[in-house]
Amino acid sequence: LKDLNIDYQKISLENLIKKTKKRYDVLTCLELIEHVPDPEKLIKDCINITNKKSDLFFSTLNRNLISYLISIIGAEYILNILPKGTHNYKNFIKPSEFFNILRKNSLVIKNIKGINYNILAKKFYESNNPKVNYILHCRKNYD
């Protein structure tokens, strides 16, 4: 991984869009969407800061009973892995809802995977089941 020209920015996306005309080939937005008041605006901002044929990666929590039990009750209240109040269930997004936003903005969905956590091993692992937490890869395909 020598000679990579990586420019890490610690700045809000809104401010970055205002600050620069630069556009990116790859964008990651991980474990953020469920914490913002307007997820669709964030997704659109992510689209606007990327090049015409960019790859975008998003991860978030699915909205269903098992996700609520694991992510809020389990992680925040039983295991105390996360501070209480970290998540608000109403902000969780079902993959189908996420797909609709992406398609509406002309993104092509390439892949979706589940992200699971093994409490005993204290390790995350990938699965084909996006029931609780998931990561998706989509691509801009604008000419």
Tell where the protein language model's regions lie, with residue ranges.
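Short, flexible, mixed-charge acidic loops at enzyme active sites
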Residues: S67-Y77
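Residue-level marker for beta-strand->alpha-helix junctions and adjacent short loops that shape enzyme
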Residues: R63, Y117-I119
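Conserved SAM-binding loop
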Residues: L1-Y68, P95-F98, L136-Y142
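Short alpha-helix
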Residues: Y89-I112
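Core SAM-dependent methyltransferase catalytic element
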Residues: K122-D143
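General small-molecule cofactor/ligand-binding pocket signal
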Residues: D7-Q9, K110-K113
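Acceptor-substrate binding/catalytic loop of class I
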Residues: T60, L79-E97
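Short low-complexity, flexible loop/linker segments enriched in glycine and/or proline
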Residues: L1-L4, I73-G74, F124-N128
